[in-house]
């Protein structure tokens, strides 16, 4: 249990004190015993919504604990905070901004915020126009050749979300007049760019500079390198930059200075946080891959969850339940690491995306009022595609000393839709999908029940090093299939989970001040490494020593 709970005043009516008491009463209760006590546990601890099914019966909770968690949410005024989120209230208190990523997926006919909806759809329509032009082979480079490769240059929210979704929905790639490939570059060291550029032709390559501030050094250093690459091949003409770059940013003036043509500038707003921005024109690579209809389905899925989140009682509200279960595991069971385990290779980049979404949002230690937090905040979030992870770190999950909570994620169906082109080996692929599903179920069962999941006769002969303690809590999210609509739903679930937890912890999930100072210090060190400055006197001994090694001046 989190040590910070011990500091609370002994107000016996406080939901936190009641939850602490529940830990003391139920700490030795095993998941297998919870199922024995409640024959209808699966039905009682699962929710079906639209094309999603959420099973949390393998969590270490009881009906009483769930009621206390809901009471905690009410005590923290969660309903009022949800209403504030879905308004134009400046709930990003440290930056005095709204947090309106939900507005990016409003239907065009939405009447509650007509001006806001209009602004969003103007920019989306401008993006759709470019998508149609590129798909039709009508967008041409400086030499008149058709664009066949598009490279997204971004980092953080301008890379992780679009990259994750584009990879996950590759099966839904639309046909274009000429083959179109979408690539992603993010690392500031240039290694990705170096590997990619020799595969591309300058005449047929378009670059997206995706940066909310249009000032991120990682992104602009890569952009400057490709600009030099293009100008070396095609000449230093204005038309080269105007034809081969699209900008996505809040800063039109900076895009103008860089030379990007006005028609190739797609605008964001300050109220869109980077890690919440894939629904905006930051999602341009997604729309290029799955088409306008596919992108609109992605938005529709997220909007459906927005409606579910606002209008469903907490007891049946999936993002609220996900958040409260995380609070229970982290703050009361002292489980401070959480694994995301998708059993579908298309979700390869989901864990990395959720790491940013959760840890950059809720990795805070100061409350909204400027006081230190009273509870531990975000756990360490990590993960991998489940079948691969089984051969990497499941040993620790099953027999290690760390308590870990898990999310298992899987599509129910695959290889059965008309657009799939697997007819010649469909039967074998369906069998492989079933193999992945069977492993997903087996692992969650073994983590929960431990030895109870084993054959009794087998258990009698097993040495202790082959036995399983179990009692590792997990939830399972099943999607009818992995398509744009359902992926939009899945992402929005996690967005709102993060928000609910921020309310419980009384922190601001929409800033990221912790990442700012490191960038500034790097800018101070760069002139030293470049030889423009040699004063190391203000640096610590370790940094001085490392710089000397890097410069070949080690003593």
UniProtKB/Swiss-Prot annotation:
Q: Which Gene Ontology cellular-component terms appear in the entry?
A: cytosol
- Cysteines joined through disulfide linkages: none
Q: What class of enzyme is it?
A: isomerase
Tell me where it mainly resides: cytoplasm
Part of which pathway?
Carbohydrate biosynthesis; gluconeogenesis; Carbohydrate degradation; glycolysis; D-glyceraldehyde 3-phosphate and glycerone phosphate from D-glucose: step 2/4
Q: Which domain of life is it from?
A: Bacteria
Coiled-coil features, chain-numbered ranges: none
One GO biological process from the UniProt record?
Answer: gluconeogenesis
Check the record and name the InterPro entries matching this protein: G6P_Isomerase, G6P_Isomerase_C, Phosphoglucose_isomerase_CS, SIS_dom_sf, SIS_PGI_1, SIS_PGI_2
Q: Under which EC number(s) is this enzyme classified?
A: 5.3.1.9
Which reactions appear under catalytic activity for this entry? Answer: alpha-D-glucose 6-phosphate = beta-D-fructose 6-phosphate
- Keywords of this entry: Cytoplasm, Gluconeogenesis, Glycolysis, Isomerase
Membrane-crossing segments per the record: none
Q: Where in the cell is it found?
A: Cytoplasm
Q: What are the positions of the active site?
A: 360 (proton donor), 391, 519
Q: Where is the signal peptide?
A: none
Q: Which GO terms describe its molecular function?
A: carbohydrate derivative binding; glucose-6-phosphate isomerase activity; monosaccharide binding
Function summary: Catalyzes the reversible isomerization of glucose-6-phosphate to fructose-6-phosphate.
Fetch the PANTHER family from UniProt: GLUCOSE-6-PHOSPHATE ISOMERASE (PTHR11469:SF1)
* Protein family membership: Belongs to the GPI family.
* Descriptive protein name: Glucose-6-phosphate isomerase
Q: Which gene encodes it?
A: pgi
């Amino acid at each position: 249990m989190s040590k910070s709970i011990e500091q609370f005043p002994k107000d016996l009516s406080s939901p936190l004190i009641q939850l602490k008491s529940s830990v003391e009463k139920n700490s030795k209760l095993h998941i297998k015993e919870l199922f024995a006590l409640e024959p209808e546990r699966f039905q009682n601890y699962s929710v079906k919504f639209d094309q999603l099914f959420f099973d949390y019966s393998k969590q270490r909770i009881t009906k009483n604990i769930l009621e206390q968690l809901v009471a905690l949410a009410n005590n923290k005024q969660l309903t009022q905070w949800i209403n504030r989120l879905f308004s134009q209230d400046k709930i990003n208190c440290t930056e005095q901004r709204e947090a309106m990523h939900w507005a990016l997926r409003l239907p065009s006919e939405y009447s509650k915020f007509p001006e806001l909806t209009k602004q969003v759809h103007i920019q989306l329509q401008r993006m759709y126009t470019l998508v149609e032009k590129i798909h039709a082979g009508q967008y041409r480079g400086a030499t008149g050749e058709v664009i066949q490769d598009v490279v997204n240059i971004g980092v953080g929210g301008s890379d992780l979300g679009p990259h994750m979704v584009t990879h996950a929905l590759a099966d839904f790639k639309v046909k274009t007049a000429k083959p179109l490939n979408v690539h992603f570059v993010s690392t500031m060291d240039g290694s990705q760019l170096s590997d990619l550029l020799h595969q591309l032709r300058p005449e047929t390559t378009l670059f997206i500079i995706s940066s909310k501030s249009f000032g991120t050094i990682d992104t602009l250093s890569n952009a400057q390198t490709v600009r030099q690459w293009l100008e070396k091949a095609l000449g230093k003409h204005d038309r080269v930059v105007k034809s081969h770059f699209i900008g996505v940013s809040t800063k039109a003036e900076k895009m103008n200075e860089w030379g990007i043509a006005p028609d190739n500038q797609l605008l964001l707003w300050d109220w869109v946080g980077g890690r919440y921005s894939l629904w905006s024109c930051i999602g341009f690579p997604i729309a290029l891959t799955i088409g306008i209809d596919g992108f609109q389905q992605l938005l529709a899925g997220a909007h459906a969850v927005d409606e579910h989140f606002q209008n469903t009682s907490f007891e049946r509200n999936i993002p609220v339940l996900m958040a409260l279960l995380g609070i229970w595991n982290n703050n009361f069971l002292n489980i401070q690491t959480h694994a995301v385990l998708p059993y579908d290779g298309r979700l390869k980049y989901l864990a990395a995306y959720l790491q940013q979404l959760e840890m950059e949002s809720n990795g805070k230690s100061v409350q909204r009022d400027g006081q230190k937090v009273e509870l531990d905040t975000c756990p360490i979030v990590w993960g991998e595609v489940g079948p691969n992870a089984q051969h990497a770190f499941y040993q620790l999950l099953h027999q290690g000393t760390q308590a870990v909570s898990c999310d298992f994620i899987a599509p129910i169906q695959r290889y059965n839709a008309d657009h799939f082109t697997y007819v010649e080996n469909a039967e074998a692929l369906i069998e492989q999908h079933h193999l992945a599903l069977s492993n997903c179920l087996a692992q969650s069962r073994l983590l929960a029940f431990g030895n109870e999941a084993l054959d009794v006769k087998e258990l009698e002969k097993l040495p202790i090093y082959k036995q399983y303690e179990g009692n590792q809590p997990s939830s399972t999210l099943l999607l009818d299939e992995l398509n744009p609509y359902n992926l939009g739903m899945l992402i929005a679930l996690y967005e709102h989970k993060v928000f609910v937890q921020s309310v419980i912890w009384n922190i601001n999930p929409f800033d990221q001040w912790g990442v700012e100072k490191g960038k500034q210090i790097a800018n101070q060190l760069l002139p030293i490494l470049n030889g423009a400055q040699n004063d190391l006197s203000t640096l610590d001994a370790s940094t001085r020593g490392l710089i000397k090694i890097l410069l070949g001046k080690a003593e």
